[in-house]
């Protein structure tokens, strides 16, 4: 008989999978609507939201995919050696952790840029308005935000995760394990 904790964990794993399955087409639909409708192409806020839709399209694949895989697949196996997707390889450890930090920070700052663009569009007497409301400037600022936070989080991609060798005392076999978020320099990004 399953305990209440196992049932709740399974439910949350299923919920994470549903978020991925529903969030992906919803964000793609948002991107399509923001890019294809003619009145939206020159609106600064909508331009930033189109970039935000693409960034938020990838966010569930970092957090929810890891959780859903752990709760729905890895816990059902008899021999559990891997508990998270991040433990599969050093590349997945680095990629998932980098993506998680980069995408969330990038989404937050794109929302800030959209809020500022909306504020500028409402204040007609600001001198910055004539420059800031040009669609090419907004596209460049959006790309600059994405590139800037990609570079800011680059040390996570470089220094996070390490591969260690352990000897299993019961079987006397050597095992290679991936430890994510274990670097001594990682504390600066938390």
Question: What do the predicted segments below correspond to?
Answer:
Residues 1, 73-102, 130, 151-190:
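Loop architecture of class A 7-transmembrane GPCRs
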Residues 22-32, 110-124, 155-167:
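Class A (rhodopsin-like) GPCR signature focused on the TM5-ICL3 interface and adjacent 7TM helical core
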Residues 8-38:
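First transmembrane helix
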Residues 12, 16-19, 48-55, 138-145, ...:
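Hydrophobic alpha-helical transmembrane segments of polytopic
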Residues 43-47:
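Membrane-interfacial loop-to-transmembrane alpha-helix junctions, especially the N-terminal start
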Residues 102-141:
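Class A GPCR helix-loop hinge within the 7TM core
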Residues 27-34, 60-67, 149-157:
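Membrane-embedded alpha-helices of multi-pass membrane proteins, especially ion channels
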């Amino acid at each position: 008989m399953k305990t209440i904790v196992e049932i709740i964990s399974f439910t949350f794993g299923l919920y994470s999978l549903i978020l991925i399955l529903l969030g992906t087409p919803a964000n793609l639909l948002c991107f399509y609507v923001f890019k294809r409708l003619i009145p939206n192409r020159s609106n600064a806020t909508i331009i930033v939201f189109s970039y935000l839709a693409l960034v938020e399209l990838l966010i569930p694949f970092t957090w929810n995919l890891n959780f859903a895989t752990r709760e729905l697949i890895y816990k059902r196996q008899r021999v559990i050696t891997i508990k998270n997707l991040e433990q599969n390889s050093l590349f997945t450890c680095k990629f998932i952790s980098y993506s998680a930090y980069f995408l969330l920070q990038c989404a937050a700052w794109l929302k800030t840029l959209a809020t500022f663009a909306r504020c500028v569009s409402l204040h007609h007497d600001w001198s910055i308005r004539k420059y800031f409301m040009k669609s090419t400037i907004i596209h460049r600022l959006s790309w600059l935000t994405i590139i800037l936070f990609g570079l800011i989080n680059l040390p996570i991609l470089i220094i996070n995760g390490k591969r260690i060798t352990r000897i299993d005392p019961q079987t006397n076999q050597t095992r290679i394990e991936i430890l994510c978020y274990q670097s001594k320099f990682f504390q600066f990004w938390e």
